[in-house]
Protein backbone atom coordinates (compact mmCIF):
# COMPACT_ATOMS: atom_id res chain seq x y z
CA UNK A 1 0.00 0.00 0.00
CA UNK A 2 2.81 2.42 0.95
CA UNK A 3 4.57 1.69 -2.35
CA UNK A 4 1.40 2.46 -4.31
CA UNK A 5 0.88 5.72 -2.42
CA UNK A 6 4.51 6.66 -3.01
CA UNK A 7 4.17 5.95 -6.75
CA UNK A 8 1.04 8.07 -6.92
CA UNK A 9 2.75 11.09 -5.37
CA UNK A 10 5.79 10.71 -7.60
CA UNK A 11 3.62 11.75 -10.55
CA UNK A 12 2.34 15.24 -11.35
CA UNK A 13 -1.39 14.47 -11.44
CA UNK A 14 -2.06 14.47 -7.66
CA UNK A 15 -0.49 17.91 -7.31
CA UNK A 16 -2.50 19.26 -10.25
CA UNK A 17 -5.63 17.85 -8.62
CA UNK A 18 -4.77 19.55 -5.32
CA UNK A 19 -4.18 22.87 -7.10
CA UNK A 20 -7.59 22.59 -8.78
CA UNK A 21 -9.24 21.85 -5.42
CA UNK A 22 -7.48 24.81 -3.79
CA UNK A 23 -8.57 27.13 -6.60
CA UNK A 24 -12.11 25.80 -6.21
CA UNK A 25 -12.01 26.55 -2.49
CA UNK A 26 -10.83 30.11 -3.19
CA UNK A 27 -13.68 30.65 -5.68
CA UNK A 28 -16.14 29.08 -3.23
CA UNK A 29 -15.03 31.45 -0.47
CA UNK A 30 -15.47 34.46 -2.75
CA UNK A 31 -18.74 33.50 -4.46
CA UNK A 32 -20.29 30.77 -2.35
CA UNK A 33 -21.53 29.08 -5.54
CA UNK A 34 -18.65 26.96 -6.82
CA UNK A 35 -19.41 23.72 -4.98
CA UNK A 36 -23.15 23.91 -5.57
CA UNK A 37 -24.75 20.89 -7.24
CA UNK A 38 -25.75 22.69 -10.43
CA UNK A 39 -22.27 24.18 -10.89
CA UNK A 40 -20.65 20.75 -10.51
CA UNK A 41 -23.07 19.41 -13.13
CA UNK A 42 -22.18 22.33 -15.42
CA UNK A 43 -18.47 21.57 -15.00
CA UNK A 44 -18.99 17.88 -15.78
CA UNK A 45 -21.05 18.78 -18.84
CA UNK A 46 -18.37 21.19 -20.06
CA UNK A 47 -15.74 18.43 -19.75
CA UNK A 48 -17.38 16.04 -22.22
CA UNK A 49 -16.12 17.29 -25.60
CA UNK A 50 -12.67 18.48 -24.39
CA UNK A 51 -12.31 15.20 -22.49
CA UNK A 52 -12.98 13.07 -25.57
CA UNK A 53 -10.60 15.21 -27.63
CA UNK A 54 -7.92 14.97 -24.93
CA UNK A 55 -8.10 11.17 -24.82
CA UNK A 56 -7.79 10.92 -28.60
CA UNK A 57 -4.86 13.35 -28.69
CA UNK A 58 -3.17 11.53 -25.81
CA UNK A 59 -3.20 8.31 -27.82
CA UNK A 60 -1.53 10.12 -30.71
CA UNK A 61 1.10 11.59 -28.39
CA UNK A 62 2.08 8.28 -26.80
CA UNK A 63 2.38 6.79 -30.29
CA UNK A 64 5.15 9.31 -30.90
CA UNK A 65 3.31 11.91 -32.97
CA UNK A 66 1.02 14.88 -32.61
CA UNK A 67 -2.31 15.39 -34.33
CA UNK A 68 -3.40 19.00 -34.86
CA UNK A 69 -6.17 18.08 -37.30
CA UNK A 70 -8.58 16.52 -34.81
CA UNK A 71 -10.80 19.62 -34.32
CA UNK A 72 -11.27 19.95 -38.09
CA UNK A 73 -11.71 16.19 -38.48
CA UNK A 74 -14.35 16.07 -35.74
CA UNK A 75 -16.14 19.13 -37.12
CA UNK A 76 -16.25 17.70 -40.64
CA UNK A 77 -17.49 14.30 -39.40
CA UNK A 78 -20.22 15.86 -37.27
CA UNK A 79 -21.34 18.40 -39.87
CA UNK A 80 -21.34 15.97 -42.80
CA UNK A 81 -23.32 13.44 -40.76
CA UNK A 82 -25.90 15.98 -39.64
CA UNK A 83 -26.27 17.49 -43.12
CA UNK A 84 -26.67 14.05 -44.71
CA UNK A 85 -29.37 12.98 -42.26
CA UNK A 86 -31.20 16.27 -42.69
CA UNK A 87 -31.13 15.93 -46.47
CA UNK A 88 -32.56 12.40 -46.15
CA UNK A 89 -35.24 13.60 -43.68
CA UNK A 90 -34.06 10.95 -41.24
CA UNK A 91 -36.19 10.78 -38.09
CA UNK A 92 -34.85 7.61 -36.46
CA UNK A 93 -32.70 7.22 -33.36
CA UNK A 94 -29.20 8.56 -32.90
CA UNK A 95 -27.42 5.22 -33.50
CA UNK A 96 -27.18 5.76 -37.26
CA UNK A 97 -25.65 9.19 -36.68
CA UNK A 98 -22.96 7.63 -34.49
CA UNK A 99 -22.20 4.95 -37.09
CA UNK A 100 -21.90 7.45 -39.96
CA UNK A 101 -19.80 9.92 -37.95
CA UNK A 102 -17.44 7.16 -36.76
CA UNK A 103 -17.09 5.86 -40.33
CA UNK A 104 -16.26 9.32 -41.68
CA UNK A 105 -13.81 9.91 -38.84
CA UNK A 106 -12.15 6.54 -39.52
CA UNK A 107 -11.71 7.35 -43.21
CA UNK A 108 -10.25 10.78 -42.45
CA UNK A 109 -8.00 9.27 -39.79
CA UNK A 110 -6.83 6.62 -42.25
CA UNK A 111 -5.99 9.43 -44.68
CA UNK A 112 -3.65 10.89 -42.07
CA UNK A 113 -2.37 7.45 -41.15
CA UNK A 114 -1.37 6.62 -44.72
CA UNK A 115 1.00 9.57 -44.98
CA UNK A 116 2.33 9.19 -41.45
CA UNK A 117 2.52 5.40 -41.14
CA UNK A 118 3.33 4.29 -44.68
CA UNK A 119 5.17 7.27 -46.13
CA UNK A 120 6.88 8.12 -42.81
CA UNK A 121 6.10 11.81 -43.06
CA UNK A 122 6.14 14.07 -40.02
CA UNK A 123 2.85 13.75 -38.15
CA UNK A 124 2.57 17.43 -37.29
CA UNK A 125 3.19 18.55 -40.88
CA UNK A 126 0.71 16.01 -42.26
CA UNK A 127 -2.04 16.91 -39.82
CA UNK A 128 -1.49 20.64 -40.34
CA UNK A 129 -2.08 20.06 -44.04
CA UNK A 130 -5.02 17.71 -43.56
CA UNK A 131 -6.67 20.17 -41.17
CA UNK A 132 -6.68 22.73 -43.99
CA UNK A 133 -8.09 20.12 -46.37
CA UNK A 134 -10.87 19.15 -43.96
CA UNK A 135 -11.75 22.81 -43.37
CA UNK A 136 -11.73 23.38 -47.11
CA UNK A 137 -14.15 20.50 -47.65
CA UNK A 138 -16.48 21.94 -45.03
CA UNK A 139 -16.39 25.49 -46.32
CA UNK A 140 -16.00 24.81 -50.03
CA UNK A 141 -17.68 21.52 -50.85
CA UNK A 142 -20.33 21.41 -48.11
CA UNK A 143 -20.69 25.20 -47.82
CA UNK A 144 -20.99 24.84 -44.08
CA UNK A 145 -23.17 27.21 -42.12
CA UNK A 146 -24.91 27.11 -38.77
CA UNK A 147 -27.62 24.47 -38.62
CA UNK A 148 -30.64 25.71 -36.71
CA UNK A 149 -32.36 22.32 -37.04
CA UNK A 150 -30.90 18.87 -36.42
CA UNK A 151 -32.46 15.40 -36.83
CA UNK A 152 -34.98 14.54 -34.08
CA UNK A 153 -32.99 11.56 -32.82
CA UNK A 154 -29.84 13.63 -32.37
CA UNK A 155 -31.78 16.41 -30.66
CA UNK A 156 -33.51 14.00 -28.28
CA UNK A 157 -30.23 12.35 -27.33
CA UNK A 158 -28.43 15.67 -26.90
CA UNK A 159 -31.10 17.20 -24.69
CA UNK A 160 -31.99 14.11 -22.65
CA UNK A 161 -30.95 14.50 -19.03
CA UNK A 162 -28.81 11.82 -17.41
CA UNK A 163 -28.71 13.95 -14.27
CA UNK A 164 -30.27 17.25 -13.23
CA UNK A 165 -29.35 19.53 -10.35
CA UNK A 166 -31.06 22.66 -9.07
CA UNK A 167 -29.46 25.42 -7.04
CA UNK A 168 -31.94 26.18 -4.26
CA UNK A 169 -30.44 29.62 -3.69
CA UNK A 170 -31.10 31.01 -7.17
CA UNK A 171 -33.33 28.39 -8.76
CA UNK A 172 -30.94 27.61 -11.62
CA UNK A 173 -31.20 24.07 -12.98
CA UNK A 174 -28.36 22.32 -14.82
CA UNK A 175 -28.54 19.20 -16.96
CA UNK A 176 -25.86 16.55 -17.48
CA UNK A 177 -26.49 14.86 -20.86
CA UNK A 178 -26.12 11.16 -21.56
CA UNK A 179 -22.98 11.89 -23.57
CA UNK A 180 -21.20 12.03 -20.22
CA UNK A 181 -21.62 8.25 -20.06
CA UNK A 182 -19.75 8.00 -23.36
CA UNK A 183 -16.85 9.95 -21.84
CA UNK A 184 -16.78 7.64 -18.81
CA UNK A 185 -16.85 4.53 -21.01
CA UNK A 186 -14.08 5.86 -23.26
CA UNK A 187 -11.96 6.65 -20.19
CA UNK A 188 -12.53 3.13 -18.86
CA UNK A 189 -11.59 1.54 -22.19
CA UNK A 190 -8.44 3.65 -22.48
CA UNK A 191 -7.48 2.80 -18.90
CA UNK A 192 -7.75 -0.90 -19.73
CA UNK A 193 -5.85 -0.54 -23.02
CA UNK A 194 -3.02 1.45 -21.47
CA UNK A 195 -2.60 -0.72 -18.39
CA UNK A 196 -3.50 -4.26 -19.41
CA UNK A 197 -2.61 -4.63 -23.10
CA UNK A 198 0.59 -4.67 -25.12
CA UNK A 199 0.08 -0.99 -25.97
CA UNK A 200 1.37 -0.08 -22.51
CA UNK A 201 4.53 -2.11 -23.10
CA UNK A 202 5.05 -0.93 -26.68
CA UNK A 203 4.68 2.81 -26.20
CA UNK A 204 4.99 3.56 -22.49
CA UNK A 205 5.37 1.97 -19.10
CA UNK A 206 2.35 2.27 -16.83
CA UNK A 207 1.81 0.39 -13.57
CA UNK A 208 -1.10 -2.03 -13.43
CA UNK A 209 -3.50 -1.02 -10.67
Regions found by a protein language model. Give the residues of each.
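Transmembrane helix-bundle core of multi-pass membrane transporters
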Residues: 7, 124-199
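Hydrophobic alpha-helical transmembrane segments
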Residues: 14-18, 43, 72-73, 95-103, ...
Amino acid sequence: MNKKVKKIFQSNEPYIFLIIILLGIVVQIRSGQFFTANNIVDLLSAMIVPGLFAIAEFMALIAGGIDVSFPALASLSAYATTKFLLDKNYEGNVLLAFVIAIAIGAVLGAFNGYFIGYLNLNAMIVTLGSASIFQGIMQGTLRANQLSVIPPGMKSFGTAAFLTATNKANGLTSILPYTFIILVLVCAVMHFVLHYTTVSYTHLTLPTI
